[in-house]
Amino acid sequence: MPIEIPTDLTPELVPLSWLIGEWEGRGRLGSGDEDSEHFVQRVSFTHNGLPYLQYRAETWLSDDAGEKLRPLTVETGFWALERKLEEGDGGPGLIPADIVPVLKTADEVEERRNKEGGFDISVSIAHPGGITELYYGQIKGPQIQLSTDMVMRGSHSKEYTAATRIFGLVDGNLLWRWDVAASGKALEAHASAFLHKVS
């Protein structure tokens, strides 16, 4: 499946452009063994002309045939190249960015490539229950690796201390795995899924 890059995409999102669109599919909780519960998921990555992707994932528990049983959770966030913000960038709050993006050309984006040949990225994801994750990691072609730098929890949130996520594009499909450290345990398999692009 060819990757189409939107003509209005800001240059620094080109490394992330293969994520843009809506994805649907099925997954398993835990390690994915025969006792692991099933889920279905719909994920969207959208852009609005600013230098980040907006992310939303909605997940339902399902039977083993993929029929939805009940809502499981929703998470939402932002994905961007990790770089020092400059005067032309927007924020904080409603302070507008310059109309011309800070990184204006493909060459300026290429200069941000790291020693491993990929690009450093940051991802923030908010969850119900007062939990927000801040991930740092790398995108290298169709592969993404993320590790939490910080997990912020509300005063009544369940214990959750760290996570890693990996994403990959394989034969036009989005595969991901999420490991978490929660409830006093070390990092362990939390969920994984296989999603196909629907738009």
Swiss-Prot record:
One of its GO terms (molecular function) is metal ion binding. It catalyses: peroxynitrite = nitrate. InterPro entries: Calycin, Nb(III)_bact/plant, Nitrobindin, THAP4-like_heme-bd. Binds 1 heme b group per subunit, that coordinates a highly solvent-exposed Fe(III) atom. Pathway: Nitrogen metabolism. Heme b binds at residue 190. The keyword Metal-binding applies. Coiled coil: none annotated. Its EC number is 5.99.-.-. It holds the Pfam family THAP4_heme-bd. Its cofactor is heme b. A motif (GXWXGXG) lies at residues 21-27. Keywords: Heme, Iron, Isomerase, Metal-binding. Heme-binding protein able to scavenge peroxynitrite and to protect free L-tyrosine against peroxynitrite-mediated nitration, by acting as a peroxynitrite isomerase that converts peroxynitrite to nitrate. Therefore, this protein likely plays a role in peroxynitrite sensing and in the detoxification of reactive nitrogen and oxygen species (RNS and ROS, respectively). Is able to bind nitric oxide (NO) in vitro, but may act as a sensor of peroxynitrite levels in vivo. Homodimer. Forms a 10-stranded antiparallel beta-barrel structure able to accommodate a hydrophobic ligand in its interior. In fact, this fold hosts the heme group, which is located in a wide surface cleft. Belongs to the nitrobindin family. This is Peroxynitrite isomerase.
